[in-house]
A protein has these predicted regions:
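Cross-family detector of peptidyl-prolyl cis-trans isomerase
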Residues: 2-288
């Protein structure tokens, strides 16, 4: 009996020692695991995420580089990148240039009346389902308060329509949410635009190119522009159309591996539908 007790005590002592060693090893592994996870989160949190960089090549003028700010206007940035990646801007013009104010481009019609289609975003749609689209205006007057960018020299912002000037004061929301593909680059500060248009980036190289474009010879416009960077200047006879075309030969975007996706699209406002809904007049029947 004494021999058994002695053996049992020794066995228990060895087992306890082994258990302590296992516990220590387990604790070391847990600490290492927690440390690794914590470092991973720290690295992710502190890792510099580069903003997308736009390279805009303008024929006979040079290259403009812009940094986009997705944290300020995510839908606007997503929209611009998707259009650029699908070659939408290649070959379009700066169709509206106002010295001391801005240069405007990105219209498929080349006169301010065009709109992008869903297919221009790289969305796979059937021909009979492809349609013009617009995006929500990411600025204060439209209920969006995360965009704190100001319309300073070098800022790129979205042009939009102002139906309140042309048709009815009731069309404020439709006006605010009418931007599609047209953009403008500020050549001077203009605080009157703050809170009413969606700035989403800034020129970081080639501001001299922007100013050279700003100084080209211009003539009176031949048509009213549906999308503008200044509603008070959207009527015809504004002297802002370049005598010689200023062509955007190519636009590329370096996203540094980040996928900015596609923007949430809205249906464009339709004048004929609005007239019918408001006044009960079907103008479509008079179209040829």
């Amino acid at each position: 009996m004494a021999i058994f007790d002695r053996f049992t005590k020794k066995g228990r002592k060895k087992m306890k020692k082994a258990s302590n060693i296992i516990t220590i090893i387990a604790l070391v592994l847990i600490v290492a695991l927690i440390g690794g996870i914590s470092y991973g989160y720290y690295k992710k949190a502190t890792m510099e995420v580069k903003n997308p960089i736009v390279t805009m090549e303008v024929q006979d003028f040079g290259t403009i580089k812009l940094e986009l700010y997705p944290e300020m206007a995510p839908q606007t940035v997503s929209n611009f990148i998707a259009l650029a990646q699908n070659g939408f801007y290649d070959g379009l013009k700066f169709h509206r240039i106002v010295e001391g104010f801005m240069i405007q481009g990105g219209d498929s019609n080349g006169d301010g009346t065009g709109a992008p289609k869903l297919s221009n975003l790289g969305i796979d749609v059937k021909d009979d389902e492809d349609r013009d689209y617009c995006i929500k205006g990411e600025f204060l007057s439209n209920g969006y308060n995360k965009n704190t960018l100001k319309h300073k020299e070098g800022i790129i912002s979205m042009a939009r329509a102002d139906y309140t000037q042309q048709y009815s004061k009731s069309l404020t929301t439709e006006s605010y949410n009418s931007a599609g593909s047209q953009f403008f680059i500020m050549t001077a500060d203009n605080s009157s635009l703050d809170g009413y248009y969606a700035p989403f980036g800034k020129v970081i190289e080639g501001m001299d190119v922007v100013h050279n474009i700003e100084n080209v010879e211009v003539k009176e416009t031949e048509t009213s522009s549906s999308s503008s960077s200044d509603s008070s200047k959207s009527e015809s006879k504004e002297k802002s159309t370049p005598v010689n075309d200023v062509i955007i030969s190519k636009v590329t975007v370096e996203t540094y591996g980040i996928d900015y996706g596609k923007p949430d699209t809205l249906e464009t406002w339709n004048y004929y539908d609005w007239v019918y809904k408001t006044y009960g007049i079907n103008l479509k029947q008079y179209q040829q």
